[in-house]
Amino acid sequence: MAKYCLKKTSKRVSCAKRYKIEKKVRDHNRKVKKEAKKNGTTNKKEKTISVPNSCPFKEEILVQAEQEREKIKVRQEAAKEAAKIHRIEKRKNNLPANFESMVAKASKQGTEFDKKVASAAEHEKFNTLDDKTIKAYASEVRKTVEIADVIIQVLDARDPLGSRSKSVEDQVLKGGKRLVLLLNKIDLVPRENVQKWLEYLRGQFPTIAFKASTQEQKSNIGRFNSAILNNTETSKCVGADIVMKILANYCRNKDIKTSIRVGVVGFPNVGKSSVINSLKRRKACNVGNLPGITKEIQEVELDKNIRLIDSPGVILVSQKDLDPIEVALKNAIRVDNLLDPIAPVHAILRRCSKETIMLHYNLADFNSVDQFLAQLARRIGKLRRGARPDVNAAAKRVLNDWNTGKLRYYTHPPEQGTAKEDIVVPAEVVSQFSKEFDIDAIAEEQNQIVEGLPMESDIIAPHNSDEEEDDDDEMETDVNEKKQTVTSGRKVKGPTKDDDKPVLPESLALEGNVQLNKLIKTAIKKQKKKSKKTANRADKLSDSLGNMLGGDAMEM
């Protein structure tokens, strides 16, 4: 063992001490550089001029090089002095000479600021409501209504009244055309809600429950028959056969021998192009979850008797009656083009329960919209410089979840005659439309589709705003809004309390169907495996004991 005096001192120090030393070194070096720059001295050594001894004119070359070096130094000093003088003059020119010049400068800056504000307002107007674009889209919709014989208005099943256009319906009725309401996206709402909306809307116009296909292939798009809707999460189309039947009934009852044109209209992003692709069973129109994909009318031949007309989505409402927040919540404007995405989030949090939002995004309790967006920004990693949360990015994330259906919601139909949105349709018109399309003949198939939807308890945890009290003004429930339920589409991960229970077939729950033979065979099989393992262990143990006893006998 080495002597104690020969052992070297360990260089290991604590991290705090090492960081402290490094910080002091940095501060010292910074101070030295600052002093050197102030005094005009530098530690940088000048590069020596080296000339080979074999050169015949070495002395003259060295003298000439020194003279050039001095000239370069003089030019650099002169440039520094000129730059210093220029900075001083510029600083003097920026200072106002008198009160009048100060006022003129302030007015100039105010004019520049007003120009910036005006340009920002024009940019917001362009992103939200472009008058030329709206007029162009509106003319395309009017053209569709004029040339079509039957109009199918596609509604979002989550908010049918919010996606319904009264002006389009008035144009259809004035033109003597036939109108059919198609309730799309029924897989996003519970069964009871769909039944109530069908009952409410059928009192005004013929209404069909529908689910457009979400498959991405170009052809052979799948569809379900109305009687076998057993998977609510399928990407196939549901209800296409019923649409074809009512159109065929209309042609037969009106004795139309030639083809008819069917116009498909509706708000942006309600699924008009997806409905046409589902009926055609191939990708005939471009689709996407962003508004403005369809920019002009497009005619698609369904068969020899039916031609479908796809129209661009537009909200035909006067600009003074148009609420920009409602437009954003209906996905009529691209989320990336919104200059203030936080305002729609206020409306979302007024319509849904705090527990639903906390469960969906896995957040702690919050008392305001700003606090919620700050927590969500940290949760999804949207941070600015200095670890400040990017609330705008978090608000856009919430809007995207709202528009794509991840944050599920649905509205409740109003009572007959109590809603401001009620459209009064004469009873003669309702009965005439029902007879022409023979709605009673497809009632049974419609009921089968609705019965195949999940119950409210399967996917929905309804929020009752009367059971909660919130002291914060920003989180207060908006009583003027339509009755609406918002739920989380987030699935709970991880083990549950029922994981420890044995998994048994569902058929055993039926009375008189216990499958005794199958259970007996399974139990016998497990018992055989267990006895076989026990026998193997006993054999190994006996072999080891025999070897030990044999070795002891040989030694004796």
Swiss-Prot record:
Which effects follow disruption of this gene?
RNAi-mediated knockdown results in a reduced body length. This phenotype in suppressed in a ced-4 n1162 mutant background.
Which keywords belong to this entry? Coiled coil, GTP-binding, Nucleotide-binding, Nucleus
**Sections of the chain in a coiled coil:** 58-95
A GO term, aspect molecular function: GTP binding
Q: Which residues bind GTP?
A: 184-187, 266-273, 310-313
Boundaries of each CP-type G domain copy? Answer: 138-317
Q: Might you report a single GO cellular component term?
A: nucleolus
Q: Where is this region: Disordered?
A: 29-50, 461-508, 525-556
What is this protein's record name? Guanine nucleotide-binding protein-like 3 homolog
**Source organism (scientific name):** Caenorhabditis elegans
Q: What is the lineage of its organism?
A: Eukaryota, Metazoa, Ecdysozoa, Nematoda, Chromadorea
